[in-house]
């Protein structure tokens, strides 16, 4: 996984899929964020379903949006 400087990585679970490859994610601490799939996951056709555990990368500037960078098997 490529790591961005300053990005915050947290674990969560997918609550609901939304249009345009967006997902509502509930983080471990109870917060809900809106996240999209990273380019590499899209490129390799990794499917994300509701209730999947994922790693989300959040920007320190906007903690309500993120990028899904990993799906646990």
From Swiss-Prot:
UniProt keyword list: Cytoplasm, Initiation factor, Protein biosynthesis, RNA-binding, rRNA-binding
Top-rank lineage group of the source organism: Bacteria
Localization in the cell: Cytoplasm
Cross-referenced CDD domains: S1_IF1
Annotated Gene Ontology cellular component terms: cytosol
Domain S1-like: 1-73
GO molecular function, one term: rRNA binding
PROSITE patterns documented for this protein: S1_IF1_TYPE (PS50832)
Its job: One of the essential components for the initiation of protein synthesis. Stabilizes the binding of IF-2 and IF-3 on the 30S subunit to which N-formylmethionyl-tRNA(fMet) subsequently binds. Helps modulate mRNA selection, yielding the 30S pre-initiation complex (PIC). Upon addition of the 50S ribosomal subunit IF-1, IF-2 and IF-3 are released leaving the mature 70S translation initiation complex.
Entry-linked NCBIfam families: infA
Family from the record: Belongs to the IF-1 family.
Subunit structure: Component of the 30S ribosomal translation pre-initiation complex which assembles on the 30S ribosome in the order IF-2 and IF-3, IF-1 and N-formylmethionyl-tRNA(fMet); mRNA recruitment can occur at any time during PIC assembly.
Protein name, as recorded: Translation initiation factor IF-1
Encoding gene per record: infA
